[in-house]
């Protein structure tokens, strides 16, 4: 199921001509050719068509024009009925300019909804109707129950519940205020400005209140009422009654954006207020009538689609058999027959023979030895060969999969053979109904991904490639007299009890399994200590076979250390039903673990459905909405590791997305951004469909956002392809002229920002928009903030639109920096990081927030003349900061620079962020330093002539040290430098304490396909930088050495910067 083939207005054409001839077929058989404006609406075209039709024969057979709609063929080769006649001709995405007039039939509302859903997800909904896979059809029906529950939940308390869905409180996970933030308050009190609109002309009045930081919004409103009524000279009783009457009728809104304080959280728990406290700013809140907000909220209706009433096509028993048998009663080894392959395209002159490599895997772990077919000539890829595996069918775990690949062999006699995978595929050995696969099957394979070093891809997607022109492998599984099912929990428990009692009867000296038998009765203190030590090991730390045996033999005691579960699961022999059954019984009653630990159980190492369900239940119990938002990128990615479409993780995320619109917004875009990826387009498309059916009126907002992004993609495609050789002036003229077209103005104004749905993008400020100079022609766009109080937050919103760069790596890096910042803040370290907004919205398409009042180091150095630009004057940056921050604010600017520089030194070192030059390090006017453009991380640094260009662990140049030491020549001997070092040390150790979290977050992203995050070897770089094999003292010594290397090797960075500056000046 591929996404839309192009972003053009007609097939193969980016923009329609200003006037275009459209062929219109009328119900009476007449064809009328109309000359239409490209931006003409369908209602205009229809009116003109019926006026023209009167000049043709048989016009008397036509009914009134309102009885008809247009239909045509779109670029997806789909027949689409156009019910919405406000749509413009250029936005219909027609294959050819041809329209047919018909009388509509069927359910009009459902057709309109299906079209809207198809547009926003980038795939016609009817494609799902055509899929014959019963799992797909059952999922579509069953997931509607989650949708219905979520919609009912939103309407539970009528308007308030609906408001909570649309404007969920944007709060920190904990109400506790970190000490260093509390110290910024005046005896625990905060000054808040409350604004009130007092006339239809939007005249404003303000009240300044000094209140306790832990007041709830209702108390703030009460205090505002008291202040407003002070001039009325009310008695204390009258005042009390007045407060009681009006307190519940008002709510607080953040001035300048769509954030509301709707719940009784302490004021300082709201992120806006906490940010104001940290930055030393006065919060501005608007008092508005609750009813005015409630009256704006749409009442969502949820209608079950027609496919929900269809009968399931899944047959409970294969081949018409009326009986089933348990997997565990079969007494034979697994075997699979490889029949033949088709569409295997190889160069016969380069390849000697081909063969099929196969393996039975559980996650990334083989359950038995891999087995290969015989080698055959490329010209005749037929095997008809049974492959026997060293595993009994009853020992197959629930998540077992067959992994296979067609491989080529190259090499002459006596020379070393070269084996290369040509295509790969995976098959679940149990389907979604717990049934063991049987019979013949054809599997279309997938192309080999970049960076795959092995012949098999066990953590890749299961199932057939929808592209039928790829290599196809035909194979056959054993048939059985009855349908074979994986046993249910009662059978598993019974078997577990039997195996435990059998184990208890073994003599330890007479069995080969003695080192794995349960020994909880003889647990010594040093055994307990060893278990605790194993528990604290990081997720990438290898567990030896002896340690696995030790863990398993003390499995019952492990329940008292709940967080050891991931290590215990890795010690299970998943090819032994005895151990799997016992593990299931342990997991069934395992105490809950923290969400950050539970997330580890969702990566590719833990494929078992019961284990993953346990992890999701922990998330349901303990994961706050704030933390869920923080980890949403990873939780969407690990959906790829789920065996089946319907699972607890899908249901958990969907329910959260449908009860919290902010979560739903990013849930939508994280799924939508991967719809071009064929390995997940069906899974993600189905999930997007179910979300869009139940998200209510927010679908209209998503429609507007997608429409705007489509317009921008089209514009940048033209600039990169058709206008690439034009001058900047000609390109800008084209951009402005195009944006002034009515369809572009409609699409690009008055919608919610995809970067932050609390921010509205109003009118485009065309005079402030520009095309940036880099090769991919990013657009720097500027919108007005239409909020009535915009001057109290920001009056314009600047966003960079990029088409051609993969922003997923930037998005991940910024998320990790944001999490680092949270850890530091909670530990009392205020390092003032600036993880600006960044969102990938499609295949190498995305948005980046522009940070206000910021400049690149290169721009600042160039202001210092030729010496500054060529790095000969290291005082340029310090002088610029002094000029920007004169008098008393100078010390604050240096402090802010020092803190942020320390934070980014530690973050860029730990994450191995490369390509650090003076164009991607920026400084704000107030002194805050931050990094941008994270195209290289985990030590994948740029190379020149085969050598890494960057020779220092992180950027700490003389320019920075001069600023930190306030201009001192011997900067390393100053107290300011010592303070800077102390900040770095504390920051490094704080992140080291949370090493497991960061390793888990990167591990969960392995399925993303990012070029620099392909394997656990890439993530091992974080183990190295955090020195996890060392003691804390040794780790600190290691980091100290890196820091010394950074500032002593700063001259090499300066040389890189000189060449970068010269190159940029040459390009411009």
From Swiss-Prot:
Gene3D superfamilies: C2 domain, Phosphatidylinositol 3-/4-kinase, catalytic domain, Phosphatidylinositol 3-kinase Catalytic Subunit, Chain A, domain 1, Phosphatidylinositol 3-kinase Catalytic Subunit, Chain A, domain 4, Phosphatidylinositol 3-kinase, accessory domain (PIK). It comes from the Eukaryota. SMART domains: PI3K_C2 (SM00142), PI3K_p85B (SM00143), PI3K_rbd (SM00144), PI3Ka (SM00145), PI3Kc (SM00146). Pathway: Phospholipid metabolism; phosphatidylinositol phosphate biosynthesis. It comes from Mus musculus. This is Phosphatidylinositol 4,5-bisphosphate 3-kinase catalytic subunit alpha isoform. One of its GO terms (cellular component) is cytosol. It catalyses: a 1,2-diacyl-sn-glycero-3-phospho-(1D-myo-inositol-4,5-bisphosphate) + ATP = a 1,2-diacyl-sn-glycero-3-phospho-(1D-myo-inositol-3,4,5-trisphosphate) + ADP + H(+); a 1,2-diacyl-sn-glycero-3-phospho-(1D-myo-inositol) + ATP = a 1,2-diacyl-sn-glycero-3-phospho-(1D-myo-inositol-3-phosphate) + ADP + H(+); L-seryl-[protein] + ATP = O-phospho-L-seryl-[protein] + ADP + H(+); 1,2-dioctanoyl-sn-glycero-3-phospho-(1D-myo-inositol-4,5-bisphosphate) + ATP = 1,2-dioctanoyl-sn-glycero-3-phospho-(1D-myo-inositol-3,4,5-trisphosphate) + ADP + H(+).
